[in-house]
Amino acid sequence: MAVCFSGVLSGAVTGVVSGVVSGVVSGAEAPSVVGGDLVEAGRQSIAVRGGAQVFPPMEYQLAFEERFAGPELNRDLWSTSLRVFGRWGDRYHNDSYLNYLSDEDVLLENGHLRLRAEHRSVEGDNPPGVYDYSSGMVSSHDKFSFQYGYIEIRAKFPGGRGVWPCFWLMPQGHQWPPEFDIAEYYAGRRMMHLGLCHGDFPEINWDSDANEDVDFEGAWNTYGLLWTPGRALWIQNGVVKREAKGSHVPSVPMYVILSNGVSSKIGPSGAPDAQTKFPNYFEVEYVKVWQAPDK
């Protein structure tokens, strides 16, 4: 497989296989700030310019960067199936979804990851069945995880009833909860869900919010999460959209999931209708993680 991972800082992340990266990042990648003040976010300071915070925090160092530059997905960093507690199979979640996860729907084109959702008949084996839709997903489980820091993607979300793309984090240790939904788009409702699931199964709790003030569909935007002990900030295009504080904020290493999906009638985006466009694509230009130097 061609290598499409652009670099890591040793010691800042877990689960990265040595010898598979094409470059090593040294020093810090920080935003350029002219003037401004500093405010505290946990133990870290964040630059403020014109009333807007600048992410990542200035002293954070780039720990992980994936730009999907190769012709094929780097299997040393990404899987295309998802084994999560409570799922009905590695390639099918539950009856909130209509799609089966297919490797054919994970594409790298023009320097972007393109996760396709398609209306086609698929015979699956995990679990067995015939599915009317397929879609693509990548997961860094057992390959890359991190505990605290700032994670960001630049992405373009598809639209249409039943369309259900998501950028989320799950715990490396197979348990569930917790879960971070950094940017989960309910396209049928034109709503971006910003969620945190916590508790002890089966007693789970959702700490959720949503916003509808960004042109999500067909436009490139950045989506990020600043995660520090006891605090999380959801950020879109450099603007904080919500905050969670308290002991329910996850404290365990988490891995990255990027997925496109098709909602059933009981799912949050509703079932597809005649106006839903297939194929549709959840496109990602990059995934980056920054961490404080002491991590």
Model-predicted regions and their roles:
Residues 1-4:
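Hydrophobic membrane-insertion alpha-helices, especially the h-region
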Residues 6-34, 40:
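Low-complexity, Ser/Pro/Gly/Ala/Val-rich intrinsically disordered tracts
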Residues 36-295:
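GH16 jelly-roll
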